[in-house]
């Protein structure tokens, strides 16, 4: 059994695509786009390359808030290109939060939920607002709100089950569960999450992290 597992692991490693191959291929396509004056395509390729470089490194890494914001901007830019006039977004981050630290890609599943689920029943007019400000001296207040379809009380209760009884989580809530699971692992009882949602009005998720780390160096480097 151990030998079969070892062979399977080797096969899996052999099947993986080297990230440098992807980066080099994207760069090649980008140069072709520029040679043909396809500036929009070049911009999209640049954003996609940045997303890939950011996401393939250690997901448990601590980064500066400003790096996480830049990643979210690129992600939302590509989603806007994909969905056209579906939504607009606004990010309000207090300047003094830029050099506070957060675990990378912690917010992405919540932003993705707003795009893919919150706006599932509309074709235009969606709005996403992300607010980041201090909570105490080193803590963070993070708010992700949308004006999408919203959720009923039963669905909200199901999400809170992920918080208080993670062993009972539903596979349909895997994105939210992953956020909660990581918050528990990184911050323990130093965080709080609130869900405010109403059918036809939208959803607001608030995360408050107390006593976060402050840094003046980008630890993603």
What are these regions (language model features)?
Residues 1-196, 202-206:
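Two-component histidine phosphotransfer core
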Residues 195-221:
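C-terminal end segment of the histidine kinase catalytic
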């Amino acid at each position: 059994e151990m030998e079969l597992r070892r062979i399977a692991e080797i096969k899996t490693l052999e099947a993986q695509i080297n990230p440098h191959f992807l980066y080099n291929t994207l760069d090649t396509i980008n140069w072709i786009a520029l040679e043909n004056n396809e500036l929009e395509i070049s911009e999209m390729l640049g954003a996609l390359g940045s997303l890939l470089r950011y996401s393939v490194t250690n997901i448990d890494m601590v980064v500066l808030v400003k790096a996480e914001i830049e990643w979210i901007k690129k992600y939302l830019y590509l989603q806007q290109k994909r969905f056209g006039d579906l939504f607009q977004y606004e990010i309000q981050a207090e300047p003094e939060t830029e050099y506070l630290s957060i675990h990378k890609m912690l917010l992405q599943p919540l932003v993705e939920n707003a795009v893919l689920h919150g706006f599932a029943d509309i074709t235009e007019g969606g709005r996403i607002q992300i607010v980041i400000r201090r909570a105490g001296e080193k803590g963070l207040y993070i708010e992700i709100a949308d004006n999408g379809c919203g959720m009923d009380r039963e669905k909200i209760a199901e999400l809170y089950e992920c918080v208080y009884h993670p062993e009972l989580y539903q596979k349909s809530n895997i994105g939210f569960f992953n956020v909660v699971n990581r918050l528990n692992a990184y911050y323990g009882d130093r965080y709080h999450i609130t869900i405010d949602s109403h059918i036809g009005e939208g959803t607001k998720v608030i995360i408050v992290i107390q006593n976060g780390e402050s840094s003046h160096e980008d630890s993603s480097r």
